[in-house]
Amino acid sequence: MDDAVLARIDIKKRKFLDVKADSAAMRRAKKEAYFQYIYHTVGIEGNTLSLAQTRAILETRLAVVGKSIMEHNEILGMEAALKYINNTLIDKYGDISIQDILEIHRRVIGNVDPVEAGLFRRTQVPNATSPVLYLQ
C-alpha cells in the first residue's frame, strides 16, 4: 500500500471513531452487520437463502416459501450462537474454554443435527463450496 491509500484509511477510521456508539446511524450499521454476518456465515456452507430472506427470518420468525427447514434452522442456530456469545462470553474474564466452544457449536447446529451438536466430529466433513483436493 502506498501512503495515499494509508492516509485515506486513516481518515475513514477517524470518521468512524467520531460516530457516537448510541447514534441511530451506528445502531443501523450494527444491525446490518449482524444480518450480513449471519447470511455470509451460513452461506459458506451452502445455504441458499438471500440476505433479504435471512433478514426476514430473523425479524419475523416466519418461514420462507420454497426453502428447506434445514436452511432456516442454520440461520436460527447461528443467531442463537451469537446471542450466547453476546450474553455470556463477551464479558468473560480469562480464556475461552473448549466447553465454551462446544456450547457455541451446540447452538449453531442444534436444530440441524441434534445428535452431533456440541460434540467433536468423528468424521471428516468437506466444505460445501470448495472442491475436495486429494494428495497424489
For every predicted segment, state its role.
Residues 1-136:
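FIC/Doc superfamily catalytic core
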